[in-house]
C-alpha cells in the first residue's frame, strides 16, 4: 500500500499542542493524548503521558522519555484500524506498519510498527485522515 501524503497538505493546520519541532513547510494536522501506544506486537511504549502529533510529513510519538519520529512517505507502508480480542479484552487501535525494523531503548529492542490506542473522538478523526491516504 502507498500512503497518499499529498492529502495531508490539503488539511488545515491546527495548534501545535505538544510544541514539536517542525521543519520548513511542515504543519501539524492532528494531535492526541492516547490512552496508550505500543509496538506492533503490543509491548507498551507509552501510556497516560504519551502524546501523538501527525504533521503533513511525520508522525511524532512522545512517551515522556523518548520521541519516535516516523517519516510517513519514507517509512510507513500501512495505517489501518485494527481490532483484537472479544468482549472485555477487546482492543481497538490504529496499526502503523513500517517498512523496516527500528531499534529502541538501549538498542536491543526492535519494532516494525506501532499501535496507537486513541480515545473514541480522536480515533474517529485519525481514521478519517488515513481513509483518504490509502491508495
Regions found by a protein language model. Name each.
Residues 1-52, 135:
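Anionic N-terminal interaction surfaces
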Residues 3-4, 66-135:
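Acidic, Ser/Thr- and proline-rich intrinsically disordered linker/docking segments
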Residues 34-36, 58, 65, 83:
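Short, well-ordered turn and helix-capping elements at secondary-structure junctions
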Residues 35, 59, 93-97:
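Short polybasic amphipathic segments
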Residues 46, 58-69:
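Short aromatic-glycine motifs in intrinsically disordered, low-complexity regions
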Residues 48, 55, 90-92:
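A generic structural signal for well-ordered coil/turn residues at beta-strand boundaries
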Residues 53-54, 62, 81:
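Generic beta-strand structural signal
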Residues 55-56, 73:
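Structural motif
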Amino acid at each position: 500500500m502507498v500512503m497518499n501524503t499529498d492529502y495531508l497538505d490539503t488539511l488545515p493546520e491546527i495548534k501545535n499542542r505538544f510544541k514539536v519541532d517542525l521543519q520548513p513547510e511542515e504543519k501539524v494536522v492532528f494531535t492526541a493524548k492516547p490512552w496508550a501506544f505500543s509496538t506492533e506486537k503490543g509491548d507498551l511504549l507509552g501510556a497516560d503521558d504519551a502524546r501523538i502529533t501527525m504533521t503533513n510529513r511525520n508522525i511524532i510519538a512522545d512517551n515522556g522519555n523518548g520521541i519516535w519520529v516516523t517519516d510517513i512517505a519514507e517509512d510507513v507502508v500501512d495505517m489501518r484500524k485494527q481490532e483484537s480480542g472479544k468482549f472485555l479484552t477487546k482492543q481497538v487501535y490504529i496499526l502503523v506498519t513500517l517498512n523496516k525494523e527500528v531499534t529502541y531503548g538501549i538498542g536491543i529492542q526492535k519494532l516494525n510498527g506501532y499501535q496507537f490506542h486513541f480515545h473514541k473522538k480522536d480515533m474517529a478523526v485519525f481514521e478519517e485522515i488515513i481513509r483518504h491516504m490509502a491508495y
